[in-house]
């Protein structure tokens, strides 16, 4: 605790960010106050603006300032392919590859019964409605490869297949440029089973 209530409040606010503990929050707060007050003002203004204007896209659920995001409005996208991701960060990672030219649906999470996150909370019914509104020929599940991501993919796959949709899952395997001796056994096992 410092001698300033405002400084303590700033440190506590910074601790709300993922991966930021007390020491990191203190370093950030001290840096902004001591060396970069203009940067602190810019950060505060950008945060204020984003909180006031960023919302969910009506079609894909990602973040946007408009009712419908630029990706969903882009006539150059392949509307026959719909890729389901957990977060906008996952969507951004796929976009950076330049390999996917279809559309997205962002779950804004993954199934986690222990945390009270079920099919309703990840928008399963919205996804089903989006995938069945016409034109979608393939739904690609790009949830993360851990227990919750796999469970999420399974539940979504079953629900979409009941609607008669073609559902695929991202392949998993050995990373490009890696050496087998350094790859974990689970990855090697999946690569062997899913070989083509």
UniProtKB/Swiss-Prot annotation:
Keywords, in A-Z order: DNA damage, DNA recombination, DNA repair, Metal-binding, Zinc, Zinc-finger
Job of this protein: May play a role in DNA repair. It seems to be involved in an RecBC-independent recombinational process of DNA repair. It may act with RecF and RecO.
HAMAP family: RecR (MF_00017)
C4-type zinc finger segments: 57-72
Family: Belongs to the RecR family.
Domain (Toprim) ranges: 80-175
Coiled-coil regions listed in the entry: none
Protein name: Recombination protein RecR
PANTHER family given in the database record: RECOMBINATION PROTEIN RECR
Gene Ontology MF annotations: DNA binding; zinc ion binding
Any one GO BP annotation for this protein: DNA recombination
Pfam families (alphabetical): RecR_C, RecR_HhH, RecR_ZnF, Toprim_4
Protein source organism: Verminephrobacter eiseniae (strain EF01-2)
């Amino acid at each position: 605790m410092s001698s300033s209530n405002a400084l303590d409040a700033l440190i506590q606010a910074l601790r709300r960010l993922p991966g930021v503990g007390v020491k990191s929050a203190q370093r950030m707060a001290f840096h902004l106050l001591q060396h970069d007050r203009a940067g602190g003002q810019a950060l505060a203004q950008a945060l204020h603006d984003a909180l006031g204007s960023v919302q969910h896209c009506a079609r894909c659920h990602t973040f946007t300032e408009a009712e419908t995001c630029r990706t969903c409005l882009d006539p150059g996208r392949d509307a026959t392919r719909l890729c389901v991701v957990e977060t906008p960060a996952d969507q951004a990672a796929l976009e950076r590859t330049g390999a996917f030219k279809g559309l997205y649906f962002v779950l804004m999470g993954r199934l986690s019964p222990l945390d009270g996150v079920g099919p309703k909370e990840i928008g399963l019914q919205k996804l089903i409605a989006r995938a069945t509104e016409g034109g979608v020929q393939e739904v690609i599940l790009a949830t993360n490869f851990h227990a919750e991501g796999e469970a999420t993919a399974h539940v979504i796959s079953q629900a979409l297949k009941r609607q008669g949709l073609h559902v695929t899952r991202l392949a998993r395997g050995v990373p490009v440029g890696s050496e087998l001796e350094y790859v974990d056994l689970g990855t090697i096992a999946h690569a062997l089973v899913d070989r083509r």
